[in-house]
Amino acid sequence: KNHRLAGEVNLFNIENDRQAMIGYRISAAYQNMGFVTEALRRVIRFCFEETGIQRLEAEVMTVNVASNRVMEKCGFTCEGTKRQAKFVNIYTDFNIYGLLRSDIMGEHAAST
């Protein structure tokens, strides 16, 4: 409504083997309104429908309950936890999430 930037979704570490990392952040004023879920779903659709990306991966702090919930709502699978993976004031655990083209587009999409 107000045409202000509320947040962003980023793709990075895009690899030749058709994998990429995905991440996002949103201003505190716009949290818990569904904007991240909506934006992430659109970027996921774009990645799998318009590019050759086969797999998206994300790392989410285990203590960030809302962000872990967004991952699950968008169809990502928690594939494990990296213990004390990064220093964020203290050493922090991160859940690793993966999403395959076939998870969104169907099994036949894995070979395209």
PLM features: what roles do these ranges have?
Residues 1-112:
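Acyl-donor (CoA/ACP) binding surface of acyl/acetyltransferases
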